[in-house]
Each structure stands twice: as C-alpha cells, then as structure tokens.
C-alpha cells in the first residue's frame, strides 16, 4: 500500500492542483480588505504565515463582510448564518472571528417584539401599527397620547397603570391605536395581548365541548397587559357578561393588571348593551357592576375622525 504522505504529494504536485492553488492565491491577494489587513499587520505577518493561512483568507473573501449586500428578506449565505467575518492574527497564523451582523440583530429584535405582542383574531396588517403613523392633528388623539405617555411612565416605575377605553365611530382607528400601544410596550420589552372580543366569545362557547374554557380564560385573565378590542360587538348573553367578561375583569381589577378597551359604544351605550340579554332580560344591576369594573380599569376617551377603512 502506498504511504498517505506520498499520495498527498502526488495530488498537490499535479499541474491542475497547482493551477487552482495559484488562482485562489491570486484572488485572495487582490481582495482590498485582505490587502488592508496585511498592511495593517505587516510587522507580524510574513509570507510563510500567508501561505499557511491561505484557506482562512479564502474563506474570508468568499463571505459577506459588512452586510451591505444583504436583505432582510433573504437568507444569509455566510458560513455562520447571521454573522460576518473579521480577520485576526492568532499567534503565527491568520484566523477568522465572527460577529453578529446588524441585519441579524434587527431581525432578532423584531422577533422578540413579536413574541411579546400576542394577538387573537386581529388582522395581521394592524399588528405593525406605530405611533409614528398616527395623525395627531385631532385633539382626541392628543389626549390619548398624553394618557399613553403617563401610563408608560407609571407602568415602567410600578408595573401598574390605568388603561384606556377608546370609543368612537366605526373605522376611526381604535384597533390601530391599541396595536400601536402594544408595539410601544414591546419596544420597552413589556408583554401584552390584543383580543378581538366577538371571535374570542365564539371560541369560548366552542370550548365548552373540549374542556379548554378555563385554560383560555386564564390566559386572558393573567396576561400582563390586556387589550379587549371591539367590546360590545359580541352577542350579549348573561353567560358572556357574567362568566366571561365579568370574570376576566374582576381578576384583572383585583390584581391591578392594566387593561385597555376599544368599542363603538360610549360607556353609557355599553352599559345599555350589557343590560339586555338576547332573551330580552333586563339586568341593570349586573350591567352597572360590569361598567364599574371597566371604568375602574380604564379612562374613557372618544376618538373622532373620518372612517379610515373606506375613504
């Protein structure tokens, strides 16, 4: 059997191998970043080190070094995905160290924010809402901004704060505002959940059959910051009012957990909605008790403006 060393000598001594090696070396030495690195370290790097580290230098030039050609929508092609290489001198060799790239940091931050902002049955296009997109020319929006600013300050300092009950005509941007508040919280690394109430109620009714009702209720009861979107649009029954909404709000009130609401109804109109069940039963005391919880948790602000969904 031919010794391995002699076999390797045979391969490396072949003309085609030597040609490829020279082409690789030429490509490496023409690279501007490599040239700059060698010049910067010319006192410690000699030709022998370059020859010894040729494979590392080639690995370096074949990768994106500054993410200038990367897109957030593309997969990273680097050896270590999401990291860019930097040449370093390591003893008598040239080596590569990898650093997290700006694009990866940004995407990781976005994923973290998305994980903090949970939603149930909310349109996906609304979940990217920010206050930078909000028209503040309307006085009602200025009042809302002031309250949100005060809330964030209080929540940051104490973990508590009074939410908002946003009400107004269909399409004036109430859900958008809730999503913007949730994103603002996520930027500060606070968790929240937005729930579209009518669909949530329908799911809870179905959960009576698969015995997941308590689990779903507890998730909404205990989330750090809750936003109930379109309260009052659900089909009103005594069970919905007392066992679902009432139970959730009682827990959140007792634990002082911040809660936000949006509705097409003013507080008085919502009270009327909760007074009458589908059967026509009139229960003013229970409706009043529920409204007390809502107004304890949230300050009412009317949002004015045109219908922004259908110009």
Curated annotation (Swiss-Prot):
InterPro entries linked to this entry: AAA+_ATPase, DnaA_dom, DnaI_N, P-loop_NTPase
- The annotated region (C-terminal domain (Cd)) lies at 137-311
**So what family is this one in?**
Belongs to the DnaI family.
rRNA-binding as a keyword of this entry, yes or no, is no
Q: Which cofactor does it need?
A: Zn(2+)
Binding-site positions, ATP: 168-175
Subunit structure, as described in the record = The DNA replisome assembles sequentially on oriC in this order; DnaA, DnaD, DnaB, DnaI-DnaC helicase. Monomer with a very minor amount of dimer in solution. Interacts with replicative helicase (from G.stearothermophilus, called DnaB); this interaction is disrupted by DnaD. Interacts with replicative helicase DnaC, forms a DnaC(6):DnaI(6) complex. Interacts with the helicase as 3 dimers. A stable complex with DnaG primase, DnaI(6):helicase(6):DnaG(3) fragment can be isolated; DnaI and DnaG do not contact each other (helicase and DnaG in this complex are derived from G.stearothermophilus).
Q: Does the keyword Protein biosynthesis apply?
A: no
| UniProt keyword annotations, A-Z | ATP-binding, Cytoplasm, DNA replication, DNA-binding, Hydrolase, Metal-binding, Nucleotide-binding, Primosome, Zinc
NCBIfam families assigned: PRK08939.1
GO molecular-function term, one example from the UniProt record: ATP hydrolysis activity
Its gene?
dnaI
Superkingdom, taxonomy of origin: Bacteria
Gene disruption: observed consequences = Essential, it cannot be deleted; in depletion experiments DNA replication slows as soon as the protein is degraded and replication stops by 1 hour.
Q: Locate the region N-terminal domain (Nd).
A: 1-136
Question: Which Pfam family would be a valid example here?
Answer: DnaI_N
Q: Where in the cell is it found?
A: Cytoplasm
Q: Name one GO cellular component term.
A: primosome complex
Which source organism?
A: Bacillus subtilis (strain 168)
Q: Provide the protein name.
A: Replicative helicase loader DnaI
**Domain description:** The N-terminal domain (approximately residues 1-136, Nd) interacts with helicase DnaC and has a Zn(2+) cofactor. The C-terminal domain (approximately residues 137-311, Cd) has ATPase activity. The ATPase activity of the Cd (not whole protein) is stimulated by ssDNA; Cd has a cryptic DNA-binding site that is masked by the Nd. The CTD binds both ssDNA and forked DNA.
Detail which positions bind Zn(2+): 67, 70, 84, 101
- What's the main place this protein lives? cytoplasm
């Amino acid at each position: 059997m031919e010794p391995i060393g002699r076999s390797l000598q045979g391969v490396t001594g072949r003309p085609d191998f030597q040609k490829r090696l020279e082409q690789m070396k030429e490509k490496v030495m023409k690279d501007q970043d490599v040239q700059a690195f060698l010049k910067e370290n010319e006192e410690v790097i000699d030709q022998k080190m370059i020859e010894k580290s040729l494979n590392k230098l080639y690995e370096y030039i074949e990768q994106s070094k500054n993410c200038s050609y990367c897109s957030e929508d593309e997969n990273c092609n680097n050896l270590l995905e999401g990291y860019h290489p930097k040449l370093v001198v390591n003893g008598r060799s040239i080596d590569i160290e990898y650093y997290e790239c700006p694009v990866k940091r940004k995407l990781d931050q976005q994923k973290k924010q998305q994980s903090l902002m949970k939603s149930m049955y909310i349109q996906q296009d609304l979940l990217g809402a920010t206050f930078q997109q909000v028209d503040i020319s309307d006085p009602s929006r200025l009042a809302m901004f002031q309250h949100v600013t005060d809330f964030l300050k209080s929540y940051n300092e104490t973990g508590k704060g009074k939410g908002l009950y946003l009400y107004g005509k269909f399409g004036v941007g109430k859900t958008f505002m809730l999503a913007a508040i949730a994103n603002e919280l996520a930027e500060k690394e606070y968790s929240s959940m937005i729930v579209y109430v009518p669909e949530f109620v329908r799911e809870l009714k179905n959960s009576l059959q698969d015995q997941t009702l308590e689990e779903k209720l507890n998730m909404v009861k205990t989330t750090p910051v809750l936003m109930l979107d379109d309260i009052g649009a659900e089909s009103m029954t005594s069970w919905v009012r007392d066992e679902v909404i009432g139970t959730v709000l009682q827990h959140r009130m007792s634990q002082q957990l911040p809660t936000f609401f949006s509705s097409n109804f003013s507080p008085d109109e919502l009270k009327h909605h909760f007074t009458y069940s589908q059967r026509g039963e009139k229960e003013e005391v229970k409706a009043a008790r529920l409204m007390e919880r809502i107004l304890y948790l949230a300050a009412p602000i009317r949002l004015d403006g045109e219908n922004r969904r259908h110009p």
